[in-house]
Amino acid sequence: MQEFTNPFPIGSSSLIHCITNEISCEMLANGILALGCKPVMADDSREVLDFTKQSQALFINLGHLSAEKEKAIRMAASYANQSSLPMVVDAVGVTTSSIRKSLVKDLLDYRPTVLKGNMSEIRSLVGLKHHGVGVDASAKDQETEDLLQVLKDWCQTYPGMSFLVTGPKDLVVSKNQVAVLGNGCTELDWITGTGDLVGALTAVFLSQGKTGFEASCLAVSYLNIAAEKIVVQGMGLEEFRYQVLNQLSLLRRDENWLDTIKGEVYE
């Protein structure tokens, strides 16, 4: 797509601080490395600021939340806000957990660069009817017309923030732009952590100076296109997971990968 410029090669090996869950931690670390940056995962409040202060972007994922992790998240988010450090917040599980939803709403005061979630999570967060269960989106929540209008209103309240909403059609909404993106494959739903990985990749592109809107579009498209390149091979679950990470490191060598992004950007 002509709207975006190729972020590769990565200009510097940025440090990406991920406060995330134990299930997808290894996948995120390898995905960040595959793009040419360096990951660190520190969620102990005694040291969290030491790592956040050295980082070029912060990714906060609410999976496996605990009181200690919440303390670390609040400390890191506060520092990111004070120092203008790019920050991605992934609203995992807010459809089910009132604690997580309350935390995300508090984190809005720290002005994250990108707020990410699946269709059900974002609908829940902005007060729309939803059918999400656990941390998964519901097929009943894929209507976008009412969601887009509410997100546009929210972007007026939080003008520096972009929304990244994952689903069969991925949505990226900022104050002045909307993208509806169509890459991807259902096989990505077979393995845990791919949604978390999108958030981490968004942080990578933010560390390279991309806006929240650009970084979100690039991240979700990059992972989806990488997956599209291998799905035709008809492989098993673990092999598919392995090859997704493999393609993340290979796709950046393709100078024309942006041409395979499917979707539209509206002003």
From Swiss-Prot:
<dbReference type="GO" id="GO:0009228">
    <property type="term" value="P:thiamine biosynthetic process"/>
</dbReference>
<feature type="binding site">
    <location>
        <position position="166"/>
    </location>
    <ligand>
        <name>ATP</name>
    </ligand>
</feature>
<dbReference type="GO" id="GO:0004417">
    <property type="term" value="F:hydroxyethylthiazole kinase activity"/>
</dbReference>
<dbReference type="InterPro" id="IPR029056">
    <property type="entry name" value="Ribokinase-like"/>
</dbReference>
<keyword id="KW-0418">Kinase</keyword>
<comment type="similarity">
    <text>Belongs to the Thz kinase family.</text>
</comment>
<keyword id="KW-0808">Transferase</keyword>
<comment type="function">
    <text>Catalyzes the phosphorylation of the hydroxyl group of 4-methyl-5-beta-hydroxyethylthiazole (THZ).</text>
</comment>
<dbReference type="GO" id="GO:0005524">
    <property type="term" value="F:ATP binding"/>
</dbReference>
<feature type="binding site">
    <location>
        <position position="193"/>
    </location>
    <ligand>
        <name>substrate</name>
    </ligand>
</feature>
<keyword id="KW-0067">ATP-binding</keyword>
<dbReference type="InterPro" id="IPR000417">
    <property type="entry name" value="Hyethyz_kinase"/>
</dbReference>
<comment type="pathway">
    <text>Cofactor biosynthesis; thiamine diphosphate biosynthesis; 4-methyl-5-(2-phosphoethyl)-thiazole from 5-(2-hydroxyethyl)-4-methylthiazole: step 1/1.</text>
</comment>
<feature type="binding site">
    <location>
        <position position="116"/>
    </location>
    <ligand>
        <name>ATP</name>
    </ligand>
</feature>
<feature type="binding site">
    <location>
        <position position="41"/>
    </location>
    <ligand>
        <name>substrate</name>
    </ligand>
</feature>
<keyword id="KW-0460">Magnesium</keyword>
<dbReference type="GO" id="GO:0000287">
    <property type="term" value="F:magnesium ion binding"/>
</dbReference>
<keyword id="KW-0547">Nucleotide-binding</keyword>
<keyword id="KW-0479">Metal-binding</keyword>
<dbReference type="Pfam" id="PF02110">
    <property type="entry name" value="HK"/>
</dbReference>
<keyword id="KW-0784">Thiamine biosynthesis</keyword>
<dbReference type="GO" id="GO:0009229">
    <property type="term" value="P:thiamine diphosphate biosynthetic process"/>
</dbReference>
<protein>
    <recommendedName>
        <fullName>Hydroxyethylthiazole kinase 2</fullName>
        <ecNumber>2.7.1.50</ecNumber>
    </recommendedName>
</protein>
